[in-house]
Amino acid sequence: MLKKTAPNSPKRRRCSSFAAVDLVGSANRTFMVSVSLPKELILEILKRLPAKSVKRFHCVSKQWASMLSCPHFRELFLTRSSSAQPRLLFAIEKHNQWSLFSLPQRLTPYEKSSSSSVVVTPEFHMKFPPDGMLIYPRHDRRFSFGYASGLMYFYGMWINEHDYDGVPVICNPLTGRYASLPFLERYRKAFSFFGFDPIEKQYKVLFMAYPSGPDHHTVLTFGTGEMSWRKIECSVKHDIVSDGICINGVMYYLGDTSEFMTAFVVVCFDVRSETFSFIYPGSYCEVINYKGKLGLVFCDDYTDDAIELRLWVLEDKEKIEWSKYAYKLKDEKFSAHYVSIVGVSAAGEIVLSMADFTSKQPFYVFYYNPERNTLQCTEIQGFEEHHGTFDRRSRVRVFVDDCSSFYRFADHVEYLNVDEPKLLKSKIYDGPNAKIEWEEEEEEDEDEDQEKEEEDQWS
């Protein structure tokens, strides 16, 4: 119920049509002033708002929730919203808890190289998991954290004290909602990746037991119905070497078909068809998203202050045709900090990041523009404010109990998942974005019927 106001004060009531309605009261009578707005104009306004504001508007009425949840508005928002600026996403793990930060990418490349650093402070989003939950497993945490189209995937969490092996968890870092997936036997070791099919609008989890084999691969579709794991076949036996990325509905990760890390293979898993294909790069490489295409990065030399690398970009998936480039990046900070390739920004710059971090030294992100041959360094400050100090050096892609770990994603967008209330029902924390409660006033039956008719128009 909405709070009642004094008789002589202006009141606003919910309307069954898309209109602004004011009830202006006086001592003797009340006047209703209604200004109707075209639905197209309302959508034009709403799609320009930040995702947090649109989330709040879900609680205006059921009619508004229906409008904001329709596929048409979802597409409009994702393609034109001012909040859809690509960002760098930082996830820091310490003492069984993640802290999630993000930082806007540069939309225009740097004009020239600079030895001085730009100092920025990332936006803090949330901590995960909440009290009472723990990260699983405690020791081997390789490839236990994934990201796809706005949602995060955690390989395993102990939800309560009765859990023995933990269950996979999917979380939205923007709103703090999460959902646990069905339990799955994990054998001695197991790895999993998270992907999104943009055609069917479906999230899927690919799970692999170690040692991998034809019958050790399963997949799950994340949705509102009954979820279950399904066995799928993989023709090439391989071990997992790298983290995975999802590009246009295909998961990519590096594997090894030998026992001595000498026969590398890029495993390609089509999220929609649930089939595997394989690319053989010839040597170790990192997989990145290069402007919506698969990119392989080979680091040929790493001197005191320079990095020599080759970049292969997959231009034709059927014929396996590549565009190949070679670069030499030089910065005095390379001598003191090992860096790794993160990906490619929306401005076409190759993004590199420090591979380790402690509170006693700065943390840097580097932007290299291959067309202009410019390198710009950005110093990130403010992690300690929300997650305390880090005395130990943390390593990338290695989850160790007594040190922190970083994962960086170069294509993070604050994605408005309008189906989230159906998919992610639990709330991690009581922040301003998590408290979305319905406040409705009682209506006559004829108002509800009219509202239902207008809801159907947006379904």
Curated annotation (Swiss-Prot):
Q: Where is this region: Disordered?
A: 434-459
Acidic residues bias: start-end ranges: 438-459
Which parts of the sequence belong to the F-box domain?
31-76
Where on the tree of life does the source sit, at the highest rank?
A: Eukaryota
Question: What Pfam families would the database entry show?
Answer: F-box, FBA_3
Please report the name of this protein according to its UniProt entry.
Answer: F-box protein At1g47340
What species is this protein from? Answer: Arabidopsis thaliana (Mouse-ear cress)
